[in-house]
């Protein structure tokens, strides 16, 4: 089968002309941009105006959410912490062969639990670790000193000129994940909150 992602408009038209099926999906993009101070509002205090245009911590991000969403995220994170789960974050060449092996065990198990073979092979990840190690950030969940789950994101540097920012931007893409143990809310922590926190810090 053939799958094309992020194809140019002319390529999409060519594919359609050749009888390929087109599938439209929705994507969610998050940017580390703190809310702009309200204009014409008493809320536009000196604190608002002094805020950086980026979140500087996960708490800053939480403060930008509604009370209900903030409460839900805090509860989910607390459930994971109360279960005794901590995280290690590894990037680039700091990810050892053993770490990659553990990640793949988790990744493979998740696919097998859903009755599918994994799309990507261990050799694929070996090649990626060898040829572009700087492009990966691995989050390993541990309990009692033993790894129990992991998630992986790809990153790339984007020149400032392409984003309109002053500095080079780091862009994180998607995630792969898997777990050897079930812990309530672990998926959210490993796949969303840990990567989001990493993005804010970097």
Say what each PLM segment does.
Residues 2-185:
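A conserved beta-strand-loop-helix scaffold within acyl/acetyltransferase catalytic domains
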Residues 183-197:
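Conserved acetyl-CoA-binding loop-helix of GNAT-fold acetyltransferases
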Residues 1, 199:
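Hydrophobic pocket-lining residues that define ligand/cofactor binding sites across diverse proteins
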């Amino acid at each position: 089968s053939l799958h094309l992602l992020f194809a140019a408009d002319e390529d999409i038209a060519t594919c359609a002309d050749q009888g390929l099926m087109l599938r439209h999906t929705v994507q969610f993009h998050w940017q580390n941009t703190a809310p702009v101070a309200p204009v014409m509002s008493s809320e536009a205090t000196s604190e608002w105006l002094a805020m950086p245009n980026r979140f500087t911590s996960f708490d800053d991000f939480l403060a930008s959410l509604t009370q209900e969403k903030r409460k839900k995220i805090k509860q989910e994170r607390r459930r994971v912490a109360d279960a005794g789960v901590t995280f290690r974050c590894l990037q680039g060449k700091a990810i050892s062969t053993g770490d990659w092996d553990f990640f793949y065990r988790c990744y493979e198990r998740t696919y097998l639990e859903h009755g599918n073979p994994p799309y990507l092979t261990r050799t694929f990840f070996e090649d990626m670790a060898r040829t572009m190690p700087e492009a990966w950030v691995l989050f390993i969940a541990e309990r009692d000193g033993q790894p129990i789950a992991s998630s992986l994101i790809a990153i790339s540097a984007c020149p400032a000129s392409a984003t309109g920012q002053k500095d080079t931007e780091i862009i994180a893409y998607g995630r792969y994940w898997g777990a050897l143990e079930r812990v309530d809310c672990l998926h959210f922590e490993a796949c969303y909150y840990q990567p989001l926190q990493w993005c804010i810090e970097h």
